[in-house]
């Protein structure tokens, strides 16, 4: 089974990418526990920023953008990790999903992971983002992983229980949704 990790984070260090990697690792373990072998492909949206802008302005997709879309289309499941900036996802998130459209995401099991700044996002934001994915005919799992600086601090202190539980629950939901999903 193929899991694509699409991360919309930028900057160094890349906390959104670290969150995505952590989630994908648990998804792979969940799949393995069910007897499935997972292959992972990573799509870093910050590397496609110029390609996404060109597509928005001229309607032309570069080779890199077409390859990213093809990777998502061929996936059995998708982990989407995006930073939350000023109570909304990053622009790369919106741009990439506009390119994908509903044909590519139809029926695709998706796990949404949000990396927040120092403040937690508005309570309804996860619902809004899940709604956007549903509007593209994707099949988002019920649990949304939300992590921020306090979670990174507790991880370094060795007390990551709550975040680990959310990741484990969401990963199990994605693995279960991926098993019957076939192209």
What function would you assign to each model-found segment?
Residues 1-80, 84-94, 98:
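N-terminal beta1-alpha1-beta2 submodule of the flavodoxin-like/Rossmannoid cofactor-binding fold
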Residues 19-23, 125, 170:
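Hydrophobic alpha-helical membrane-association signature
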Residues 23, 27, 95-111, 117:
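P-loop/Walker A phosphate-binding loop and immediately adjacent motor/lid segment at beta-alpha junctions
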Residues 36-37, 105-109, 138:
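A short helix->loop->beta-strand "cap" motif at the edges of active sites that frequently abuts
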Residues 41-52, 134-154:
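Mobile beta-alpha loop/short-helix "lid" or hinge segments that flank ligand
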Residues 110-149, 161-165:
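Short, glycine-/small-residue-rich phosphate/pyrophosphate-handling segment
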Residues 139-183:
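Glycine-rich phosphate/pyrophosphate-binding loop and the adjoining helix
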